[in-house]
């Protein structure tokens, strides 16, 4: 199954044709797809109307620098701001994480989308791509925040996606533009980076997104192309039974598998349920690549959003304004 990107704020005829394809599980939206709150709500409805089956509509609405929808939405603080409070008041910090998750998820769901790919559970240890997207460098602290964030998302009827397995936070390289290699042994990864993923799985996380990072002491290929990581460790050792997403096959670190068809097949053969094809110019080639493959369509049904107030109902809900105010008072930024 593929999650695809579309070019703009309205669907083109070609994109409507893509949505008819059996392999298309849904759409990932980006800043380029956003003009206003009403427009993105209408776009979500148009995607659903154009497809013959339920579509999973997703976004990265983490907060901080990774927030695709801004005007008309709460300006969500980065997770690191919440993590910094843990040392002085762990209980308050965890409550804020749950509120942050609730606020993010309620606004995304009100716009007609199913999920935001969240939370980031990588360790905050200097990676250029992760930075303040991570709660903390401490695995146990991130584990506690992970469970709280999953609870907040689930309270709104949004599935939670742990990313980027088995941990992207310790390598310096940004896999959007570079190859990233983590030389550590599996035992060290188990004691560090895997701890938050274990906590998230125990809390009921619904999906996991793979990293395009190579861990050569564990497997020779990037984790998203690795049966060792997906089937033996994530599913076998950690007991994860949910949906496994690849990261975007347009990222530089994904190119090690070869061209677009090779990347798609490598992810699916390794055990990914869904491959992200976020660049529209790659979609035709990816769709051609999956012709004839057996597709696990049922796996995604559990990720569809459950219940939503819509914007009128959400803005009339006192909890929305109260949560905005509490985050502002505590973290000192406009939400």
From Swiss-Prot:
It is found in: Cytoplasm. Keywords: Cell cycle, Cell division, Cell shape, Cell wall biogenesis/degradation, Cytoplasm, Glycosidase, Hydrolase, Peptidoglycan synthesis. Substrate binds at residues 60, 68, 133, 163-164. The keyword Cell wall biogenesis/degradation applies. One of its GO terms (biological process) is peptidoglycan biosynthetic process. GO terms for cellular component: cytoplasm. Plays a role in peptidoglycan recycling by cleaving the terminal beta-1,4-linked N-acetylglucosamine (GlcNAc) from peptide-linked peptidoglycan fragments, giving rise to free GlcNAc, anhydro-N-acetylmuramic acid and anhydro-N-acetylmuramic acid-linked peptides. This is Beta-hexosaminidase. The gene is nagZ.
